[in-house]
Structure formats: structure tokens, C-alpha cells
From Swiss-Prot:
Protein name as annotated: SsrA-binding protein
Function description: Required for rescue of stalled ribosomes mediated by trans-translation. Binds to transfer-messenger RNA (tmRNA), required for stable association of tmRNA with ribosomes. tmRNA and SmpB together mimic tRNA shape, replacing the anticodon stem-loop with SmpB. tmRNA is encoded by the ssrA gene; the 2 termini fold to resemble tRNA(Ala) and it encodes a 'tag peptide', a short internal open reading frame. During trans-translation Ala-aminoacylated tmRNA acts like a tRNA, entering the A-site of stalled ribosomes, displacing the stalled mRNA.
Classification via PROSITE patterns: SSRP
One example GO MF annotation: RNA binding
Length: 155
């Protein structure tokens, strides 16, 4: 793998189901030593995690990084709040988005890029139940079209 490309460690598939993703940002993570080792082993869960802007800084909450197996008593807290590294103008944009009604910050995926752990952060707006049903109908219709097309190709 070339040095610049990132290796995806974890994805938040539920985020695309529950939210409309308006915009995405790449952010670095402030981690402890045993956390990065657990991330490299793929022991991360983004399921219920979210980000908040507090006092001009962005923090990631509820991201579960399992304790490192070979770690000793100095192992990290699995659910601790982690600071995200973004440029000031990006943080200001995120502050503007989160001030609007209905927008939240959701981590979409976690990956390693040039040896550093990065999070793809999405500015998201919640879907209503009928939006989810509409998406399911659209996906099912697309599957039917592809299935019919494949059957036609066989003939």
C-alpha cells in the first residue's frame, strides 16, 4: 500500500442509515500509547459515538477503543473523551453547522493515514422514519432493476 493512502479500520454504517450526511471533514485524534495499538489491531467501535464542539475545540464522545491486551496497569479508559485535531476555520464552520437546528457531528470512519489515526467526521441531519422507508424502497427497486437486467443479459 502506498504511504499516502489510508487503511480503513472501522466504519459507522449505521450513520448513513440514520442521517443525511451534508459535508465531511478529516480530523486527527489525540490518543494515548495503548489506544493507537488497539486501533491498529482493529479493536474499535464507532456505533454510538458523536462529536461536540466545546470551548472552541472538538471532542469525540462514546468511541469505544478496547484495552490493549498486552497493556499493563497503565491501559486507557475505553470510552474516554478524545480531542479531535482540526484547523481553526474548519472548527468555526462546524460551530456554525451545530448552531443550526437538527445538525450533529457523526464519525463515519476511522483509518490510518501516513501512520496517524484519522477520523472522517460528517455533518449530519437526522432522518425521519418515512425517509428511512423511502430509502429502503429505492434500494429494493434498484435491486429489482439490476436483477432483471442480469436475467436479460443471460438470454
Amino acid at each position: 500500500m502506498p504511504k499516502g493512502e489510508g487503511k480503513v479500520i472501522a466504519q459507522n454504517k449505521k450513520a448513513h442509515h440514520d442521517y443525511f450526511i451534508e459535508e465531511t471533514y478529516e480530523a486527527g485524534l489525540v490518543l494515548q500509547g495503548t489506544e493507537i495499538k488497539s486501533i491498529r489491531n482493529g479493536r474499535v467501535n464507532l456505533k454510538d459515538s458523536f462529536a461536540k464542539v466545546e470551548k472552541g475545540e472538538v471532542f469525540l464522545h462514546n468511541m469505544h477503543i478496547s484495552p490493549y491486551e498486552q497493556g499493563n496497569r497503565y491501559n486507557h479508559d475505553p470510552l474516554r473523551t478524545r480531542k479531535l485535531l482540526l484547523h481553526r476555520r474548519e472548527i468555526n464552520k462546524l460551530i456554525g453547522y451545530t448552531k443550526e437546528q437538527g445538525y450533529t457531528l457523526v464519525p463515519l470512519k476511522l483509518y490510518i493515514k501516513n501512520g496517524f489515526a484519522k477520523v472522517e467526521l460528517g455533518v449530519a441531519k437526522g432522518k425521519k422514519k418515512y425517509d428511512k422507508r423511502e430509502d429502503m424502497k429505492r434500494r429494493e427497486a434498484q435491486r429489482e432493476i439490476e436483477r432483471a437486467f442480469r436475467e436479460r443479459q443471460k438470454l
